[in-house]
Design a protein with these regions (language model features):
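Short, low-complexity N-terminal intrinsically disordered segments enriched in polar/charged residues
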Residues: 1-37
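Hydrophobic, well-ordered secondary-structure segments
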Residues: 1-14, 40-46, 66-67, 97-103, ...
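Short coil/turn segments at secondary-structure junctions
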Residues: 2-3, 51-52, 108
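Aromatic-acidic/polar surface patches that form glycan- and anion
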Residues: 8, 12, 24, 57, ...
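A solvent-exposed, acidic/Ser-Thr-rich amphipathic alpha-helical stretch
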Residues: 28-100
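A beta-strand edge to alpha-helix "cap/lid" segment located at domain peripheries
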Residues: 73-176
């Protein structure tokens, strides 16, 4: 017999894994089935800032979807996510996972390959349509390869500019 807790864990793992699948396949519309209406997606640098508060990085799903293509422009990516650890708390959950992220310039050779070892903390909420990601925090634990063609830090700064911190009221106002 499958318990509700087990079904929830499986759905949460699927949602967190599918986020990276959509990113790698540039399936931006697929994010509609994975992200809450408002999400907190701070960059690694923002997470390390003194006084970091994930609630202050609330953005609309539409803003996050619009910012992703610029972050990944000119790159082939593959995110291998594993080791999901799910903590359920009623209609909210946290899922932690590790990943190895491979980045290669579109049309580039093996010498241009860049890899990152990341740790993720997903925050999820149960909705009428199932579990949705309401927040994600990322820590880059290690880097390998020549990042000069990739410029991850510059790209993340541009991402932060495109999905600047806003209040929940501002998100609702823009969508309204």
């Amino acid at each position: 017999m499958v318990t509700q807790a087990l079904a929830d864990r499986l759905e949460i793992i699927e949602v967190c894994t599918r986020l990276h699948w959509c990113v790698d396949h540039r399936d931006w519309d697929g994010l509609d089935d994975l992200l809450a209406d408002h999400v907190s997606f701070p960059t690694p640098a923002e997470i390390e800032a003194p006084g970091f508060d994930p609630a202050s990085y609330l953005r609309s799903r539409a803003e996050v979807k619009a910012a992703y293509p610029g972050l990944l422009a000119g790159l082939l990516t593959q995110h291998l996510i594993t080791g999901h650890q799910v903590e359920l708390d009623g209609d909210r959950a946290v899922c932690r996972a590790h990943s190895v992220n491979v980045h290669l310039p579109d049309g580039g050779g093996r010498d241009a390959l860049v890899a990152h070892g990341n740790e993720y903390r997903f925050e999820l909420e149960r909705t009428e349509k199932g579990w949705r990601i309401s927040g994600r925090q990322t820590w880059i634990r290690w880097r390998w390869g020549d990042e000069t063609h990739y410029e991850v830090d510059r790209r993340l700064l541009q991402w932060a500019d495109q999905v600047r911190p806003v209040s929940s009221a501002e998100c609702n106002q823009r969508e309204g």
